[in-house]
Curated annotation (Swiss-Prot):
Annotated protein name in UniProt: Large ribosomal subunit protein uL6
Assembly mode: Part of the 50S ribosomal subunit.
Gene designation per UniProt: rplF
Pfam family, one: Ribosomal_L6
Keywords, in A-Z order: Ribonucleoprotein, Ribosomal protein, RNA-binding, rRNA-binding
Disulfide bonding pattern of the chain: none
Organism: Jannaschia sp. (strain CCS1)
Amino acid sequence: MSRIGKRPVELPGGVEASVSGQTVEVKGPKGTRSFKATDDVTVSVDGNVISVEPRGKSKRARQQWGMSRTMVQNLVTGVTDGFKKELEITGVGYRAQMQGNVLKLSLGYSHDVDFTVPEGVTVTCPKNTEVIIEGNDQQLVGQVAANIREWRAPEPYKGKGIRYKGEYIFRKEGKKK
């Protein structure tokens, strides 16, 4: 029995959920999100509670049970609080700034890197060494943060690059003479 899957998902005030077939749609103050569950699980809404049940006893049904419940929980969290990733830029001359819908990154290359922000995500730069990514889709927010970090991942000798806020960078000692 799935310890995660058997717990129902509570709907906070101001959030509505509907199920049509295998598609769960959640509406809240931060927008609307939907998720298509696999045929191995049954999703139902009872008042302000969403419950997910497996359709059989197969291993795949039990695997999908916990995953589907977590996906529904992420829909509810996304439309109420949203998701947020913070990046820190470390290095001499490394900086970021927003220009309309484009994040302009100076990362020590011979040219600036222009990153176009996709729909459904907002990117802000409170300081030129900080980038904040927010949205109601956890997967999209994380993917955008990973794509930005990929341009200059932190290196282990000086720690220069783009890192997640609070991320520990394993440091190495340089060569000895």
